[in-house]
């Protein structure tokens, strides 16, 4: 049985700083982007402002669209195409910079020069009022701070068990992500 991975609440800055990737195995491997802030992301939830989109490619009508997503910490490209028809339709209708909440898959591409390019392929896009955008951003920051607290504890207490961390309220995926982040981003 397949399941959808949880969408990690992250900022543009956290996405921009996530340069380590874990690739799964098997017939349909799942890739995860590891954040130095303690997230192991396949899907993300982001909140900020989307710029008006532009078509990519030469198809007529366009089958792939790109926009720029900006939050108080930075900006990241957001895309949608034929495999995400609802998100593509939602993205195409944005006429002016608009506060939005987006759920999508994170994608890391390394160019020939080995420079990392990170984008989010939107699954859903929802235009929101500024008050809702601020509330979602506050929730994202709370999650980031809680994950950083967990990272600090795992770093200071390397022998602490997953059961002890879970009993203290840390969600299982956060524990796995914290350990992976400390392994990939040693301090």
Where are these regions (language model features)?
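OB/S1-fold single-stranded nucleic-acid-binding modules
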Residues: 1-40
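Short histidine-centered beta-strand/loop micro-motifs
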Residues: 35, 55-61, 90-92
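Structural detector for short beta-strands of small beta-barrel domains
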Residues: 41-61
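Short, surface-exposed secondary-structure boundary micro-motifs
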Residues: 49, 105-106
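OB-fold (S1/OB) nucleic-acid-binding surfaces
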Residues: 55-84, 124-128
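Extended, charge-rich, solvent-exposed interface segments
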Residues: 85-86, 92-99, 103-105, 111-187
């Amino acid at each position: 049985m397949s399941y959808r991975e949880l969408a990690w609440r992250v900022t543009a800055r956290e996405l921009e700083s996530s340069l380590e990737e874990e690739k799964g195995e098997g017939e349909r491997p799942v890739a995860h982007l590891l954040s130095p802030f303690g997230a192991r992301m396949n899907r993300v939830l982001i909140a900020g402002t989307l710029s008006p989109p532009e078509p990519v490619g030469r198809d007529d009508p366009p089958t792939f669209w790109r926009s720029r997503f900006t939050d108080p910490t930075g900006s990241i490209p957001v895309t949608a195409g034929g495999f995400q028809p609802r998100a593509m339709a939602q993205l195409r209708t944005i006429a002016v910079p608009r506060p939005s909440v987006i759920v999508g898959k994170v994608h890391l591409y390394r160019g020939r020069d080995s420079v990392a390019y990170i984008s989010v392929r939107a699954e859903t896009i929802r235009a929101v009022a500024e008050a809702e955008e601020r509330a979602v951003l506050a929730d994202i920051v709370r999650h980031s701070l809680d994950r950083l607290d967990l990272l600090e504890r795992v770093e200071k207490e390397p022998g602490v068990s997953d059961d002890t961390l879970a009993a203290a309220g840390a969600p299982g995926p956060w524990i796995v992500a914290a350990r992976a982040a400390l392994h990939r981003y040693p301090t």
